[in-house]
């Protein structure tokens, strides 16, 4: 499974990339707006920080404008993935951009039918939103499982990019169900390494080592 970090904060991206914890980045207009910086400049800077895919979302609502924005974003760097909403217009734009060998991430997927349409439109990634489904009392993991079955049944190349990840448990469940990618905030990705028994074991090791009075260096 690949890990993408869901943020537009370049300092956080650089830290995680240096540690080798991320394979790519996802952004959206809301995340970039919080930075107060120029949209295109932020996307370009992120693309320079990581070698993997960087999802940058269009803001237009009609297919022709989405396509134009997507082409402009794709010119920023080779690793740009154009993020499109899962609407009728978004699917038309996806098909057009895919035909020009531009990678796409069709986002805001909340049903297996939507995901199937995105795959048929040639999406590189489809992003089912787990946490937001859970908020409605719907099991988001059922969507991951259904998409995995459908994509395998018909040999779609579209990758399942699990989004709206809220916890380490979400990532574990997505991994067990066969999601190709999980994108999560920096805090969730960093939290994957934490376990109380690891901390307790390290504390005991260090206490024993201190008693020896030795130093490796």
Curated annotation (Swiss-Prot):
Query: Mainly resides where?
Result: cytoplasm
What CDD domains does the database record attribute to this sequence?
Transaldolase_FSA
Q: Which GO terms describe its molecular function?
A: aldehyde-lyase activity; transaldolase activity
Q: Does the keyword Zinc apply?
A: no
Name the top EC class.
transferase
Q: Which GO terms describe its cellular component?
A: cytoplasm
Q: Which PROSITE patterns match?
A: TRANSALDOLASE_1 (PS01054), TRANSALDOLASE_2 (PS00958)
Q: Which InterPro entries match?
A: Aldolase_TIM, TAL/FSA, Transaldolase_3B, Transaldolase_3B/F6P_aldolase, Transaldolase_AS, TSA/FSA_arc/bac
**Is S-adenosyl-L-methionine given among the entry's keywords?**
no
The job of this chain, per UniProt, is described as: Transaldolase is important for the balance of metabolites in the pentose-phosphate pathway.
Return the protein name: Probable transaldolase
Organism, scientific name: Maricaulis maris (strain MCS10) (Caulobacter maris)
């Amino acid at each position: 499974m690949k890990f993408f970090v869901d943020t537009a904060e370049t300092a956080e991206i650089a830290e995680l990339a240096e540690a080798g914890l991320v394979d790519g980045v996802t952004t959206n207009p809301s995340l970039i707006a919080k930075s107060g910086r120029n949209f295109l400049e932020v996307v370009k800077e992120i693309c320079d920080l990581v070698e993997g895919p960087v999802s940058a979302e269009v803001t237009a609502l009609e297919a022709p404008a989405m396509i134009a924005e997507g082409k402009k974003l794709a010119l920023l760097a080779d690793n740009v993935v154009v993020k499109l909403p899962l609407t009728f217009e978004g699917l038309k734009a996806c098909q057009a951009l895919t035909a020009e060998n531009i990678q796409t991430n069709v986002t805001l997927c909340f049903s297996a039918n939507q995901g199937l349409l995105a795959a048929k439109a040639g999406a590189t990634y489809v992003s089912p939103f787990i946490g937001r489904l859970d908020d409605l009392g719907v099991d988001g993991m059922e969507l991951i499982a259904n998409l995995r079955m459908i994509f395998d049944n018909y040999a779609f190349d579209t990758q399942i990019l699990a989004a709206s990840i809220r916890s380490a448990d979400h990532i574990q469940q997505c991994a067990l169900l066969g999601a190709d990618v999980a994108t999560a905030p920096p805090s969730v990705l960093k939290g994957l390494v934490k376990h109380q028994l690891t901390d307790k074991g390290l504390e005991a090791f260090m206490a024993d080592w201190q008693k020896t009075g030795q130093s490796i260096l």
